[in-house]
């Protein structure tokens, strides 16, 4: 009885993972040094693709262009 309960526990934990990274889109996102988020990308990041087999968003750091005024010589 204990063995069957243990096997059922292992089976249920392996089948019902929330954030499985086995999706090919997740692997591509991580290879490009981006991050995966399940809800939406933070303010300072742009959405560039999907993760977790289409259930999440692949986010890339936003390039900020800040102009620095030149000193007058």
UniProtKB/Swiss-Prot annotation:
One of its GO terms (biological process) is defense response to Gram-negative bacterium. The gene is Defb39. The lineage of its organism: Eukaryota, Metazoa, Chordata, Craniata, Vertebrata. It is found in: Secreted. Its main location: secreted. One of its GO terms (molecular function) is CCR6 chemokine receptor binding. Pfam families: Defensin_beta. Keywords: Antibiotic, Antimicrobial, Defensin, Disulfide bond, Secreted, Signal. It comes from Rattus norvegicus (Rat). Has antibacterial activity. This is Beta-defensin 39. Belongs to the beta-defensin family. InterPro entries: Defensin_beta-like. Residues 1-23 form the signal peptide. Disulfide bonds join 29-58, 36-51, 41-59. One of its GO terms (cellular component) is extracellular space. PANTHER family: BETA-DEFENSIN 39 (PTHR21388:SF6), BETA-DEFENSIN-RELATED (PTHR21388). The keyword Transmembrane does not apply.
């Amino acid at each position: 009885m204990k063995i069957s309960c243990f096997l059922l526990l292992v089976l249920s934990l392996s089948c019902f993972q929330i954030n499985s990274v086995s999706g090919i889109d997740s692997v591509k996102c991580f290879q490009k040094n981006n991050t995966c988020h399940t809800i939406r990308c933070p303010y300072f990041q742009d959405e560039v693709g999907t993760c977790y087999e289409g259930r999440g968003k692949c986010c890339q750091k936003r390039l900020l262009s800040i102009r620095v005024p030149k000193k007058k010589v």
